[in-house]
Amino acid sequence: MRRKVFEELVTATKILLNEGIMDTFGHISARDPEDPASFFLAQKLAPSLITVDDIQRFNLDGETSDNRPSYLERYIHSEIYKTRPDVQCVLHTHSPAVLPYCFVDTPLRPVTHMGAFIGESVPVYEIRDKHGDETDLFGGSPDVCADIAESLGSQTVVLMARHGVVNVGKSVREVVFRAFYLEQEAAALTAGLKIGNVKYLSPGEIKTAGKLVGAQIDRGWNHWSQRLRQAGLA
């Protein structure tokens, strides 16, 4: 079972790179299906180089017995797994269309059925609230990342002010699906704001559409996996 998780993490990384969601500094993790007090995350490498042999195992304090280099931002993952037992996968990216919503006052809200999983709006973690305006804006310490997890609350995504995006979900595939459509939703909202008054999803539409779209996760995964094969990347 763990081997399957490793393979999904590698495939997910390739999909996110191929679809333009992840850049050089993104990373995705999965909770250990055999030990919920642990999670898997690749060693500190450029994402395009990651293989199943690069996966490290961490406890919920972000510690590992693996002596290879680890991402400093592993605490984003550990603190979310610690506070959200329902979460099985965590992704951190600098998703291009979403990134502007990390530094403007306009909230990121769903405007189409594909973005219903967002909820009524995406929370933003503001590091200045506790740490002032001379930080590196980085999620590299347990205390900062505990605050990120707190800002996430029970939602599916949180933005890090002037930095990036954190997606969570109940599976690797679900998180990839959500990351792709969060990017699409942000691009659609930005375009809509340039045209006229935006009509956002209602609470009822968010609830109902979210259930319908959530059932299509494997379809998305299969499509993006095929695109990898067509590109010679799988």
UniProtKB/Swiss-Prot annotation:
GO molecular function ontology, one term from the record: manganese ion binding
Pathway(s): Cofactor degradation; B6 vitamer degradation
Annotated positions binding Mn(2+): 73, 92, 94, 163
Cellular-component GO terms for this entry: cytosol
Stretches assigned to coiled coil: none
Family per similarity comment: Belongs to the aldolase class II family.
SUPFAM superfamilies registered for this protein in UniProt: AraD/HMP-PK domain-like (SSF53639)
Record field: catalytic activity: 5-hydroxy-6-methylpyridine-3,4-dicarboxylate + H(+) = 3-hydroxy-2-methylpyridine-5-carboxylate + CO2
Assembly and oligomerization: Homotetramer.
Cofactor remark from the record: Binds 1 manganese ion per subunit.
PANTHER family hit by this protein: 3-OXO-TETRONATE 4-PHOSPHATE DECARBOXYLASE-RELATED (PTHR22789:SF0), FUCULOSE PHOSPHATE ALDOLASE (PTHR22789)
Upper taxonomic lineage: Bacteria, Pseudomonadati, Pseudomonadota, Alphaproteobacteria, Hyphomicrobiales
Location of the active site: 73 (proton acceptor/donor)
Metal-binding is among the record's keywords: yes
Alphabetic keyword roster: Lyase, Manganese, Metal-binding
Protein name stated in the entry: 3-hydroxy-2-methylpyridine-4,5-dicarboxylate 4-decarboxylase
Record function comment: Involved in the catabolism of pyridoxal 5-phosphate (Vitamin B6). Catalyzes the decarboxylation of 3-hydroxy-2-methylpyridine-4,5-dicarboxylate to yield 3-hydroxy-2-methylpyridine-5-carboxylate. The decarboxylation proceeds by an aldolase-like mechanism in which the binding of the substrate frees Glu-73 residue from its interaction with manganese ion replacing it by an interaction with the hydroxyl group from the substrate. Glu-73 residue then provides the proton for the keto-enol tautomerization.
Annotated GO biological process: pentose catabolic process; vitamin B6 catabolic process
Protein's UniProt keywords contain Cytoplasm: no
UniProt EC number: 4.1.1.51
Named cofactor requirement(s): Mn(2+)
